[in-house]
């Protein structure tokens, strides 16, 4: 196959429940890749010595018009009726809104349960070509369950990695939470770098804040965890790096609706001096709900009691971290 999308289409057309493996030769592959829902899982792996040897990239802005998006995403009829990924493309190209929005700004989008990615780079190359305003530019979006990502670079600026629970209608759902494991990887961006409603474990992964576009506060995590679900994002044995002194925050809740209370835990990780130790967590995006930490109360036995899922408080935690940015400083009482 001459394109990654053609290889994906061929694998999906087999309609088998057996895993299909796609080896990607070193090179730069410009354009989107859509992996549809299918009976079996798909594995894409780069055959180079390192992840940067295989680079999948395109410049897409969530603020662009559907017409401009169609021009950039579907040259020469890459997506056509009858092809496996047509339903994914059509859910975005048929929009009647002024802009395509964050969910359709992804360079690599998968709805495949059991997707595996290894040893490659996925980048939304919009980068610093736009101003500091709202410019969602997703590099990787996954909707499927039991996704595994290992030794992958995920590069962008705003909403670099978006983990949703959308169904085939391309809308957020309230009855399922897809699971993802990310290991030995590198994720880069500025605003709400990792966002969405999925449950994700990050192990031995580096998060790097690049604020050359915004020149202001940046945010690593923006979980949109449903309030009745206890687990969102977990980062363990990982590294958080930002340039400057206290310019970044670890995250904030992505309050997409009234049933959202983002959940994230960062533990056993290194956090550098680029993070705001006085206020490591920000106010919620969209709702502007002020951050409220849950310190609990002391009972008659001098034991601290607290409901970790109390909707009156945020669910964002740090445990056993190290580095200058890991020191939590209590704000003065008002």
Task: Tell where the protein language model's regions lie, with residue ranges.
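Sequence-level preference for short, compositionally simple segments enriched
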Residues: 1-334
């Amino acid at each position: 196959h001459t394109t990654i999308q053609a290889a994906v289409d061929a694998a999906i057309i087999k309609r088998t429940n057996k895993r299909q493996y796609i080896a990607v030769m070193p090179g730069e592959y410009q354009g989107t890749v859509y992996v549809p829902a299918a009976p079996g899982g798909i594995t894409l792996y780069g055959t180079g010595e390192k992840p940067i040897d295989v680079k999948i990239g395109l410049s897409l802005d969530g603020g662009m018009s559907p017409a401009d998006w169609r021009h950039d995403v579907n040259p020469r009829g890459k997506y056509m009726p009858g092809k496996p990924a047509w339903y994914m493309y059509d859910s975005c190209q048929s929009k009647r809104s002024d802009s395509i929005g964050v969910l359709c700004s992804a360079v690599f989008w998968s709805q495949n349960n059991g997707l595996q990615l290894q040893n490659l780079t996925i980048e939304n190359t919009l980068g610093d070509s736009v101003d500091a305003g709202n410019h969602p530019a997703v590099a990787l979006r996954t909707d499927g369950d039991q996704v595994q990502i290992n030794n992958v670079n995920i590069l962008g600026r705003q909403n670099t990695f978006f983990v949703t629970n959308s169904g085939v209608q391309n809308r957020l759902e309230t009855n399922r939470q897809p699971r993802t494991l990310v290991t030995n990887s590198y994720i880069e961006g500025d605003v709400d770098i990792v966002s969405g409603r999925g449950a994700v474990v990050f192990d031995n992964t580096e998060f790097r804040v690049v604020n050359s576009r915004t020149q202001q506060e940046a945010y690593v995590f923006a979980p949109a965890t449903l309030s009745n679900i206890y687990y969102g994002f977990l980062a363990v044995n990982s590294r958080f790096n930002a340039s400057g002194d206290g310019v970044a925050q670890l995250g904030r809740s992505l309050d997409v609706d009234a049933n959202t209370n983002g959940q994230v835990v960062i533990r056993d990780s290194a956090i550098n001096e680029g993070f705001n130790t006085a206020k490591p967590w920000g106010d919620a995006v969209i709702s502007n709900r002020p951050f409220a930490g849950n310190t609990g109360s002391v009972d008659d036995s001098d034991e601290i009691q607290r409901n970790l899922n109390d909707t009156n408080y945020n669910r964002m935690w740090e445990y056993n971290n190290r580095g200058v940015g890991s020191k939590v400083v209590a704000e003065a009482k008002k």
